[in-house]
C-alpha cells in the first residue's frame, strides 16, 4: 500500500532532523524508505522504522504518524517495540516522532507515560509538521 502524501512529508521532516543531529561525515548512513537510500532494517517486533541511523554509540529510530495513524494499536505496538530496541542498545538513543501539530499534546502525554512504564532513558523528540521540536 502506498504512503499518503502527508505521511511522506512527515517522514521527510524526521529525516531532516536526524541528518542535523548525526555527525556530518555520517549523514549518508541515515536510512529511510526512498529511492535515494537503503530501506531501514526490520527491528525487534518485526517493525521497520521510517528513519534509521546506527553507529557504535548512537541509535536513532524515526517514525511518522498521521492523525489517523497515531491512536491505532499497530502504532502503539511499534512505539513499544522501538523503545525496547533502544533499551537494549549500549549508547545514546533517540526516538524521533513526526506528526501533525494537533497530536503534539497527546503524543507528549503518551510518551511520558510510556517512558515511565518501560523505565526508559531514550530521548524522545516529537516534531510537528512545521519542524517545531518538543522533547520528552
What is each model feature region?
Residues 51-72, 82:
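Conserved catalytic cores of phosphodiester-cleaving nucleases, focusing on short active-site segments
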Residues 73-97, 103-114:
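Short, charged, amphipathic alpha-helix that recurs within catalytic cores of restriction-modification
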